């Protein structure tokens, strides 16, 4: 895997539905019964990671796996169903094989507030070797 491009930026928009909210994330739990119908933190993290994959995956050959190996996340403002988030992803220069660092930010299009930010390290490793080491 070689990345000679300096900084890349990717942006996408996701509309929040009831399925993305706190009561829906773990059906049958106290969280589902008492949680507010706002964008769930776990769902927002998944959206940020998905947007990142849209940027990173095209540069990574199929024989390599991309695995999260560190990160810091902040959920900074609520988002309601029907509202949209614009996700902006940035990646700095990446080594030939190893760790990549990227930052994904979600902004509530309707309120202008930052909804969340994820700073994430991703390791790019040989897929077959990884699964051998994991005993699979």
Each model region followed by its residue ranges:
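A generic structural signal for short beta-strands and their flanking turns/coil linkers
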Residues: 8-12, 67-71, 83-87, 98-100, ...
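HotDog/MaoC-like acyl-thioester-processing domains
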Residues: 80-81, 90-136
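Catalytic strand-loop segment that frames the active site of acyl-thioester-processing enzymes
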Residues: 2-39
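Hydrophobic beta-strand-centered segment that forms part of the acyl-chain substrate-binding groove
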Residues: 52-86
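A short mixed-secondary-structure module that forms the rim of ligand-binding clefts
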Residues: 41-43
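Non-catalytic surface loops within mature trypsin-like serine protease
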Residues: 18-20, 77, 124-126
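A structural signal for short, well-ordered beta-strand segments
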Residues: 10-16, 71, 75, 89, ...
């Amino acid at each position: 895997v070689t990345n000679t491009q300096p900084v890349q930026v990717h942006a996408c928009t996701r509309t929040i539905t009831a399925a993305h909210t706190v009561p829906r994330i773990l059906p049958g739990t106290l969280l589902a019964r008492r949680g507010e119908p706002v964008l769930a933190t776990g769902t927002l993290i998944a959206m940020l990671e998905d947007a990142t994959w849209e940027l990173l995956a095209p540069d990574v050959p199929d024989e390599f796996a991309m695995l999260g190996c560190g990160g810091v996340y902040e959920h900074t403002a609520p988002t309601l169903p029907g509202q949209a988030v614009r996700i902006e992803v940035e990646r700095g220069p990446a080594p030939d094989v190893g760790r990549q660092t990227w930052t994904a930010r979600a902004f509530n299009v309707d309120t202008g507030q930052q909804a969340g930010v994820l700073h994430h390290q991703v390791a790019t490793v040989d897929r077959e070797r990884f699964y051998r080491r994991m005993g699979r």
